[in-house]
């Protein structure tokens, strides 16, 4: 919970800042260097201040800053605030856009809505061949903390379209679909094909769309061809819409 402080009859809302922690032992959380610097040097919190801690796996605690250190700050966890056992049932394989700002926008919004895995893929018509994973991970982490979500999405390494089908465990997904603009391929609406509770994997192609061979390959691998509406969508918009529709059908938004 956050706090209200009353000063001379005036009530002031004081939100608790959220920090992500991988290293939690019993009731002690040790923040890494990046989160420690943010706590002490950016937010200028002090020992005794109350914060929120998330582990990215569905848990959120209230804690007290116990030992300040710019490389490893110690937080004593006082009580559990929230606990969720089911991660978002949405994963998206998507081609990074030529303009990286648009891809970063997708990552931010999909994280806010709720997403489990993001697989950047390279197709024949891809215009961007490399991404900065470290920078993109920071965008995802910030969006996770800002949105209040308890699950930190996993951004996987960039992978070719061919290797994607060979290396990803597609059997772990109970619903697989792809969006494309090829009108002579049979397509159904996502709303009519997806059923609540299915673990979904959605494929989004590049600005120039998937090739016919890529579409055929995906269909052979069990992907359904779907449409997301009547409009022709940008890559990042298609990813966000697919994510939103799947979460909506699972009553998450």
Please tell me what each predicted stretch does.
Residues 51, 75, 152-157, 225:
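Generic structural signal for residues in well-ordered beta-strands
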Residues 212-253:
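Structured adenosyl-cofactor binding patch, chiefly the S-adenosyl-L-methionine
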Residues 22-23, 33-34, 56, 96, ...:
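Fold-independent oxyanion-binding glycine-rich loops
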Residues 1-83, 134:
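N-terminal positively charged helical leader segments and presequences
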Residues 176-217, 223-230:
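Active-site/ligand-binding-proximal alpha/beta "capping" segment
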Residues 84-177:
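RNA substrate-binding interface of SAM-dependent RNA methyltransferases
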Residues 95, 129, 207, 231, ...:
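Glycine- and other small-residue-rich loops at beta-strand/loop junctions that grip anionic moieties
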């Amino acid at each position: 919970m956050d706090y209200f402080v009353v000063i001379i009859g005036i009530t002031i809302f004081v939100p608790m800042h959220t920090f992500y922690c991988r290293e939690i032992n019993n009731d002690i959380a040790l923040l890494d260097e990046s989160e420690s610097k943010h706590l002490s040097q950016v937010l200028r919190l002090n020992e005794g201040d109350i914060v929120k801690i998330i582990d990215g796996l569905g848990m959120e605690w209230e804690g007290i800053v116990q030992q300040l250190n710019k490389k490893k700050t110690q937080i004593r966890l006082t009580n559990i605030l929230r606990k969720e056992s089911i991660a978002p049932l949405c994963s998206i394989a998507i081609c990074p856009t030529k303009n990286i700002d648009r891809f970063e926008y997708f990552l931010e919004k999909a994280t806010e809505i709720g997403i489990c895995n993001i697989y950047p893929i390279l197709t024949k018509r891809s215009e961007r061949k490399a991404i900065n994973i470290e920078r993109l991970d920071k965008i995802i982490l910030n969006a996770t903390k800002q949105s209040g979500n308890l699950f930190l999405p996993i951004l996987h390494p960039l992978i070719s379209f061919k290797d994607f089908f060979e290396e990803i465990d597609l059997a772990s997904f109970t619903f697989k679909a792809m969006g494309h603009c090829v009108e002579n391929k049979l397509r159904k609406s996502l709303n009519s094909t997806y059923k609540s509770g299915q673990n979904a994997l959605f494929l989004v192609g590049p600005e120039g769309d998937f090739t016919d061979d890529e579409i055929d390959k995906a269909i052979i691998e069990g992907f359904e061809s779907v449409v997301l509406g009547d409009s022709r969508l940008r890559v990042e918009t298609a990813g966000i819409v697919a994510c939103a529709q799947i979460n909506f059908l699972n009553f998450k938004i």
